[in-house]
Amino acid sequence: MTVIVTGAAGFIGANIVKALNERGESRIIAVDNLTRADKFRNLVDCEIDDYLDKTEFVERFTRGDFGKVRAVFHEGACSDTMETDGRYMMDNNFRYSRAVLDACLAQGAQFLYASSAAIYGGSTRFVEEREVEAPLNVYGYSKFLFDQVIRRVLPSAKSQIAGFRYFNVYGPRETHKGRMASVAFHNFNQFRAEGKVKLFGEYNGYAPGEQTRDFVSVEDVAKVNLFFFDHPEKSGIFNLGTGRAQPFNDIASTVVNTLRALDNLPPLTLAQQVEQGLIEYVAFPDALRGKYQCFTQADQTKLRSAGYDAPFLTVQEGVDRYVRWLSGQV
């Protein structure tokens, strides 16, 4: 049966397509918007049956043009948290997602979709409960509102609906994201260009570079998606993070040491990297004061209760792999 991936040329979508290919799935319809044409590179080493622009997909899917569809991985969205055009964001992320959901429910197709940890906003608890959800931007609100629709639909749904609140995802195939690419990606490019990585200094009680995030490898994101693909009886909204909060220092230090290893140089401690000027701290920008999350950490209780028991890569493991992959691309 056919599998559809929206946002297929994007970061997470392309990694899901590749992961499907690696297990023998190639009857894949890729859906995206290639106005930003450079995204096509993410699919060059992937096998797909067909490609559709997002503007024609929903109408054709709704009228059954693709025959029996097993599942839709709905990864397509505007993920720019700095986007201020609320009308565009709601149409692209909310209304479009509702249309894809409705078509999946009508045809009995599995619906696996990208939610976001941005739903939690400034919360200090990251559990899938309404009372801790307070998005700070229209991107987060578009995801939040769709999750509320899912909560209302789930009790009567006859086919799988699984949403994943992605935390800070990094890994291959994100180059096209520009400023919205991961910290690991930017640290890699900065070190290659300048010979050092710059991090924010002390802020809000956190020592320089010690602001923390739940950084999750896109490898693990794809694995979780495929676990639910294999278990259509499991539905719900799930946090998708490692369950660990690691500081930005860990990302930067791993980037530096991996690049040193590729040059046959020995690893350095964080203190040595700072002392040698390989990591530098800059004053926290006034523009971000009061708008910056210093801590995120996924509560994995629901995900683990659903049966996903595989370990997640640490920053040191995942970023090392990613830097080696990036080094092979340049």
Curated annotation (Swiss-Prot):
Annotated transmembrane regions: none
Catalytic activity: ADP-D-glycero-beta-D-manno-heptose = ADP-L-glycero-beta-D-manno-heptose
A GO biological-process term: ADP-L-glycero-beta-D-manno-heptose biosynthetic process
EC id: 5.1.3.20
Pathway given in the UniProt record: Nucleotide-sugar biosynthesis; ADP-L-glycero-beta-D-manno-heptose biosynthesis; ADP-L-glycero-beta-D-manno-heptose from D-glycero-beta-D-manno-heptose 7-phosphate: step 4/4
Record-listed NADP(+) binding positions: 11-12, 32-33, 39, 54, 75-79, 92, 143, 169, 177
Domain of life where this protein originates: Bacteria
Cofactor detail note: Binds 1 NADP(+) per subunit.
Entry cofactors: NADP(+)
Enzyme type, top EC level: isomerase
Keywords: Carbohydrate metabolism, Isomerase, NADP
GO molecular function: ADP-glyceromanno-heptose 6-epimerase activity; NADP binding
Binding residue positions for substrate: N168, R179, H186, F200, G201, E202, Y203, R213, Y292
Active site: Y139 (proton acceptor), K177 (proton acceptor)
Assembly description: Homopentamer.
Family: Belongs to the NAD(P)-dependent epimerase/dehydratase family. HldD subfamily.
Function statement: Catalyzes the interconversion between ADP-D-glycero-beta-D-manno-heptose and ADP-L-glycero-beta-D-manno-heptose via an epimerization at carbon 6 of the heptose.
Free-text note regarding domains: Contains a large N-terminal NADP-binding domain, and a smaller C-terminal substrate-binding domain.
UniProt name for this protein: ADP-L-glycero-D-manno-heptose-6-epimerase
UniProt source species: Burkholderia ambifaria (strain ATCC BAA-244 / DSM 16087 / CCUG 44356 / LMG 19182 / AMMD) (Burkholderia cepacia (strain AMMD))
